[in-house]
Amino acid sequence: MWVCLQLPVFLASVTLFEVAASDTIAQAASTTTISDAVSKVKIQVNKAFLDSRTRLKTTLSSEAPTTQQLSEYFKHAKGQTRTAIRNGQVWEESFKRLRRDTTLTNVTDPSLDLTALSWEVGCGAPVPLVKCDENSPYRTITGDCNNRRSPALGAANRALARWLPAEYEDGLALPFGWTQRKTRNGFRVPLAREVSNKIVGYLDEEGVLDQNRSLLFMQWGQIVDHDLDFAPETELGSNEHSKTQCEEYCIQGDNCFPIMFPKNDPKLKTQGKCMPFFRAGFVCPTPPYQSLAREQINAVTSFLDASLVYGSEPSLASRLRNLSSPLGLMAVNQEAWDHGLAYLPFNNKKPSPCEFINTTARVPCFLAGDFRASEQILLATAHTLLLREHNRLARELKKLNPHWNGEKLYQEARKILGAFIQIITFRDYLPIVLGSEMQKWIPPYQGYNNSVDPRISNVFTFAFRFGHMEVPSTVSRLDENYQPWGPEAELPLHTLFFNTWRIIKDGGIDPLTRGLLAKKSKLMNQDKMVTSELRNKLFQPTHKIHGFDLAAINLQRCRDHGMPGYNSWRGFCGLSQPKTLKGLQTVLKNKILAKKLMDLYKTPDNIDIWIGGNAEPMVERGRVGPLLACLLGRQFQQIRDGDRFWWENPGVFTEKQRDSLQKFSFSRLICDNTHITKVPLHAFQANNYPHDFVDCSTVDKLDLSPWASREN
């Protein structure tokens, strides 16, 4: 467990938020001392990482993995991400050890040579992981080299950006709620599960659907989110605190921060005292070390670049391709086909948790550019559509340009698919999320600006979780007449987690895609926030295991990430900052909800950003309140304007290519990549069959003729 240094003299001499930027302020820790400390910590952390990987493989090889183990499969860091997180953990543990040891001999000046420490750990300054070719017309897989002045800006496996300084209990890494007697702004923070029970939960599913948004609207939000950010969990770095202690005995310590159940919680009878919770992976601090507060990693590129299709690391990108073909194709499933159309390939690295959902079918999880692709089957369906579209584009481009080799075809198809995702998001999705606030936060495009920081902010990873309020309790599968498909046409949401067999063995993606088009999202309601399917049964695909609470996880994660409170973000966005119950009632326009929040948090200053932002009434024609409109709008504007390869930036595509791209629609993508023949023109709006549906023959096709090379 973290032990907060309590020497008054130390606290008077150096704050935890600011450490001088000098390479060697003092010689309290010699190079030898640093080297010795780092060596010892590396042994400890490396063992923890190895033990964790071994344990995960062993438990998933059993016939009964726990909910935590299923979750861990997708939140488990891999590749370069794992290395970056391991270095971050070694740095932090070494810093704690050196600070503790050096203060014993030099209380008046305990500063460390942080540059030497970073070098010894293997951190160093952020540099591109690939060689930059400034003349390349294509993005790198890692996101490096986009900004020529700062090539690592927006790249994968770097820290999430901070728009406001982190707020931790100890100023460095401990989340609020870690120490029972510690307060925040004079008040103890409420249990995350208690907030979920009293504010987020509801029982009656009647009247919760959004009469103006399709289910695809919800699903596209998850696609965009997975393209932009992913913060895997870290490992326990101490021998004193095992994952078993965390999961089975709720013993808090190291990077275990269990979500405790309040009194009278029904889960106390079935799940013990808590839900296990492991803290997010973090990276080394970077020069000039103005802050040593823990900074969480973004394992994927910050750009809206279809990284969830192609990956954010070269090794994964290569694994996803069909390199035996000269057509620039992505690899597809060789064991199963969807009536002649391709599925995502299986991730055949054993073990696969998806196999345990139906032990008779034993269908593995899918392999995609994002490891979360099999988390739920609507997400897997969307991934499948994007994979098919890449291969369709590559084949069509080959017809136009027979002389193009596989690499050229792959890169051009990847470039076009990335543009599709950008266009659909900014033209079709964001305007009906931000509503009347769209033009305020995302004005018309003025071109690339290399001074704009495109990195995903830490707060955005919580703001964009508004989509959890849009998930309905059931998912429907529909036939070619948009009527219920089969005897199990409507499935409870919780049965669809990791459920790849429902796609492979039970109908393919067409019935699910029709459900996305013709069924509705859930409407965010101040009295009915998150369905019980997510609030009590998250990652509970079978009755044999207990589900998690996504709302409580979101709240605990806010604290894990050191998120400033509700009013800090209201101030950041230029909005009023309510200080009293009456003030909060005015902002929320809901006396009952305001009182519930004040009873729990005591002050609006302490309200966690996820619940505070989502509690606000929605802006006109939008699906978020003023605070989330600000945070989301600001982030998407920076993603667009700070991207040198943005589809509208002159030189990325020709004028004729841009004209062609603008005619693309998600409905056309479905027509081209499924057996579906009837689609709505506005796929994110709520649509009723047959009134709002048209034949695919009337939907504009993408004209690829502007991509014909002059060399033909």
From Swiss-Prot:
The active site is at H226. Mammary gland; milk. Ca(2+) binds at D227, T301, F303, D305, S307. One of its GO terms (biological process) is response to oxidative stress. Its EC number is 1.11.1.7. Glycans are attached at N106, N212, N322, N358, N449. Residues 23-100 form a propeptide. Thiocyanate (SCN(-)) and hypothiocyanite (OSCN(-)) are bound in the distal heme cavity. The iodide ion (I(-)) occupies a position which is stabilized by the interactions with heme moiety, His-226, Arg-372 and Glu-375. Hydrogen peroxide is held between the heme iron and His-226. This is Lactoperoxidase. It comes from Bubalus bubalis.
